[in-house]
Amino acid sequence: MELFNKEFSDAHNSLADARACGECYPYLKNHVNEFKSIGVNKVIIKASDVAGTTGCHPFRKPDEIINELWHKYFPESCKTQTREQVAMGVLTSMGSTEKILNDANGFKANTTAEVQKKLRGAYYDLERSGLSGPDTVAAKDYIKKTLYTNFGTQNEQRTADEDSAYLIRDDTFYSLDVCEIMGTKYQVVGRIDRLQVHENGSKTIVEIKNRMDGLFNVVRDYEEIQCQTYLQMVPNISFCRLVEQHDVYRKGYLIQKNTEKWKNDILPSLIKFCEFFHSTISKNVTNTRKHGLDSRAHKEIQTS
């Protein structure tokens, strides 16, 4: 919209999509990053978002992460609400929908069937709440994410306790420097689920995934990127064991540290994301601040 002064219509129509791509391609081809000092010493990217920054996560897109970082570090200049802000605005707009939100936040379950039952009930209530179509979709997505995330968090300890290996908690927030642009350091920060301690004293990172709809029976690309990120962040560890659990069923997958993949694939994509974010902020925030200073100076001249 801001680039072309119009909105593209008929999304997911193959002809309309092709035409839109034809208009976007020349801009993307000729796009040049613009780097300026943005007045922030450090920008932190969550380790779980690294796959999203590289475009490999089906549910976390780069533009969504950029929008969230923009809101976090430069809220005064960000014009677009995050998905969470939109959903929270919808769910708190009426007493009935706010009750659905509070129920979801406080809900505890021992099985995935209990979560699915609660979700169906929430969907039923939202569809009859009087919300518009788009608002209903936003509210449903947020309630689903809340119930699924809370279930995973609440049952992480149980999944760890049921593991046959000796697992310990590690509350350390590990960090990894990505790059530095015009005085701003970009850093990945995250905390691992558990550490497995072997008899010889060596350790393995354990990443726990509580599944809602059944076992995946495979490590998804975005999950491997998350594990590779942890293996780069945590020193002196060469393996990460991903444990997926769906109720009483579980599987484990051993992932070996792949420094070549990190250096040649993941890290370059992550750096490009940081560069694009920094360029976007350089073009928008610095102009906004300059406009604010110019307006303030103009007022001071008028009142002097």
What name fits each language-model region?
Residues M1-K36:
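Acidic, Mg2+-coordinating catalytic module of metal-dependent nucleases/exonucleases
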Residues S9-N13, L147-F151, N155, V218-V219:
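Conserved aromatic-histidine-acidic binding/catalytic patches
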Residues E34-E162, R296-S304:
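Charged, glycine-rich intrinsically disordered N-terminal tails and low-complexity linkers that flank
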Residues T286-E300:
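Non-catalytic accessory segments flanking enzymatic or RNA/DNA-binding domains
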